Amino acid sequence: MTKDILILAVETSCDETSVSVIKNGRDILSNTVLSQIESHKRFGGVVPEVASRHHVEGITTTINEALVDADVSMEDIDAIAVTEGPGLIGALLIGVNAAKALAFAYDKPLIPVHHIAGHIYANHIEEPLTFPLIALIVSGGHTELVYMKDHLTFEVIGETRDDAVGEAYDKVARTIGLNYPGGPQVDRLAAEGEDTYSFPRVWLDKDSYDFSFSGLKSAVINQLHNQRQKNIPIIEANVATSFQNSVVEVLTFKAIQACKEYGVQRLIVAGGVASNKGLRQSLADQCKVNDIQLTIPSPKLCTDNAAMIGVAGHYLYQQGRFADLALNGHSNIDLEEYSAE
């Protein structure tokens, strides 16, 4: 009988302290998430120093809760997986040092995990990954298209040249007057409005899978500034709808085109913006038309969580990709360099 593999995973790359226990690469035995949204809301965004302090305060309790919820002890754990980057360096160091302490104290292998690899593997929890596939990464810090021909092989075929899509959402939300976090509020507001503005769709070079959202963001900001200067009423829902349609159209088109060019019949979506209802519907419609299998995690698995780190960690464990106690956090790590090849 094959022994179950239990991975204890730690995620502290931004403003969630999360610890999870994953069995055999798919089964979530626990997934404890300590959110800091209320602490950062008054600042209109994540404050790195505040995030780090909250991680320090919560990491030990979160580890203990995850073990209790999973009904396991550290002796049952086979390895410790931890996000080493990218992310806020102060926040990352809390999780990395906690994971190193556990690995040392209990003599367990230590597995460094790329944060974006974790988001990709969140899809595997609900529907096993099949290859080849295209992954659309949409989050506050990243917007990428990634081709994968097997587990842990990452070829970045497109990425943002300026703002990440989630960053653009938050800045537009602030301009409209919405509270942090702005992305979900723009999405909700977009469902109520009409596409009355001619905001740009930025396609860049012909056949390019890169993205650019700074021009769109600036167009929205300038439009609202001009209307306020002239005392022209602003219909916030229409701004949200027009902005979101511009974003979603470009993301959907490039993701579908990538699937066609690479001969792929599987598209997965990863990152916090993957919970956006407008994007989910657009991708679902176009994937149906083009006979492409679409997988998007449940909203609770789109945001930062340790379960996704544990799933990616399971496959790294199988490949024997361990780190020693000199492991450090890194604010930037290239996904392709992290690839198995």
Curated annotation (Swiss-Prot):
Cofactor(s) annotated in UniProt: Fe(2+)
UniProt cross-references to InterPro entries, sorted A to Z: ATPase_NBD, Gcp-like_dom, KAE1/TsaD, Peptidase_M22_CS, TsaD
Entry GO MF terms: iron ion binding; N(6)-L-threonylcarbamoyladenine synthase activity
Binding annotation for substrate: 137-141, 170, 183, 187, 276
Compartment list: Cytoplasm
Catalysis performed (reactions): L-threonylcarbamoyladenylate + adenosine(37) in tRNA = N(6)-L-threonylcarbamoyladenosine(37) in tRNA + AMP + H(+)
Cofactor, free-text remark: Binds 1 Fe(2+) ion per subunit.
Predominant cellular place of this UniProt entry's protein: cytoplasm
Protein name (record): tRNA N6-adenosine threonylcarbamoyltransferase
Biological role stated in the UniProt entry: Required for the formation of a threonylcarbamoyl group on adenosine at position 37 (t(6)A37) in tRNAs that read codons beginning with adenine. Is involved in the transfer of the threonylcarbamoyl moiety of threonylcarbamoyl-AMP (TC-AMP) to the N6 group of A37, together with TsaE and TsaB. TsaD likely plays a direct catalytic role in this reaction.
